[in-house]
Amino acid sequence: MKLYEQALWFAGVTVEEKRFMSENQSSAPIAENKMGTMPVGKLVFNMSLPMMISMLVQALYNIVDSIFVAKLSENALTAVSLAFPLQTLLIAVATGTGVGMNALLSKSLGERNFKKANKIADNAAFIYAISYIVFLILGFTIVKPFYASQIGNADVEIMNLGIDYLSTVMIFSFGLFTQIFFERLLTSTGRTIFSMTSQLCGAITNIILDPIMIFGLLGFPKMGVTGAAVATVIGQCVAGIVAGTCNHKYNHEVSLSFKGFRPDISLIGHIYAVGIPSIIMQSIGSIMTYSMNRILIEFSSTATAVFGVYFKLQSFFFMPVFGLNNGITPIIAYNYGAQQRKRMIRTIKISLTTAFCLTFIGFLCFEGIPQVLLGMFNASADMLKIGVPALRIIGIHYLIAWFCIIAGTVFQALGKAVFSMIVSIMRQLVVLIPAAYILSKIGGLHVVWWSFPIAEVISFIASMAFLIRIYKTIISKIPEGKL
């Protein structure tokens, strides 16, 4: 399937009504659509805003979750922060599998092979069920060794709090897998508004339940850190129910039927062929946070808590940029296929400007009001002493991170995802972790934080080199076209 045709399906501009569908129906000619005709600025806004809002709300509820946990104690905040690597892995498996499912679904829908599309959805549901069973087992078996590998047995309170939190999240992760499965089905047919709606419902549910479950309000028992986990999984279940309902009512292109179902090993293999690279890409963050926790815990548990707070705050400023990415990917891909260089370049320029503005706000906050940011998490005097310089040092990388993020999106949209993978691995594993380890040995804790700007500078250089290469070999050879 051509790249611009896939982009059309992700954007939902070629989805026809159910009454026109039949298994053997040939595809009608594709008329000019908004991605080739709408003014680029308006198009980027329309395509990106829903995902930006959705991801901003997701980031907000992650922050609110930690703010409430921090009111319990610094140890509680540290325990939740240490859970991040496995939580990241959990999300990576769910979303990466969804990427593989979406790719095959989009191709089958573009070919108007609805029988195959339904079969892909059935097999993807089977994969999600098996994935949940795996994490269910891990939730009972691996959580304690996981915490012990990061902090040893020195701090029993942190370990016990962490085990309660992470076990709950993993054992009841069926809500997360259900949510992402149905949201990806909606996305594959262009119904992103319903995907956003389900995410908002889940996030709002989580935000409302957090204080109730954690502090025992409205007659509920005080559950502490476990309450935060319970609120999270209930929010995921609500999002899954909403997404499933929207699929049943509005997604007429894909239907699920498990009557006489047998797993198709070939289809499952194709789903993973596309999904595993995405899982690996997202899992890099899991390895990075685990390794950083190991380095920082050598100084103090407070240092680990500061790192956890930084990650929550970073998500708030970066998630809207990632939402922008989701919006511009099909625009760039479509206009690449349609040979419209002016529209491609205009899209990239608008995206770079928007991403810079968003991350510059983060830079100003990290440099100007770190005490306020840390104060939201009930920071102790020790946490402020460590956290204020840490946020100011790490915040420097916001000045160039915007470029690396958008460049990675351009690579993926033009079919050069390997460049994104190289830059991501370079930033998070090849440079960041070794730099942090070396700096931890030759200087104090405040020196370790410089590993983040160092890694970003190297990533910036690599991204620039790859982008120049892509411009010379691909973009410059495309006809200018109309704007």
Regions found by a protein language model. Give the residues of each.
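Short runs within selected transmembrane alpha-helices of multi-pass transporters and secretion channels
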Residues: 98, 168-187, 195-203, 228-243, ...
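Hydrophobic transmembrane alpha-helices of multi-pass small-molecule transporters
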Residues: 89-92, 136, 206-211, 240-244, ...
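Transmembrane helical elements of multi-pass membrane transporters/channels
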Residues: 46-65, 168, 202, 235-239, ...
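N-terminal transmembrane alpha-helices
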Residues: 35-67, 71-72, 88-100, 104, ...
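Interfacial/gating helices of multi-pass transporter permease domains
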Residues: 46, 69-88, 120, 156-161, ...
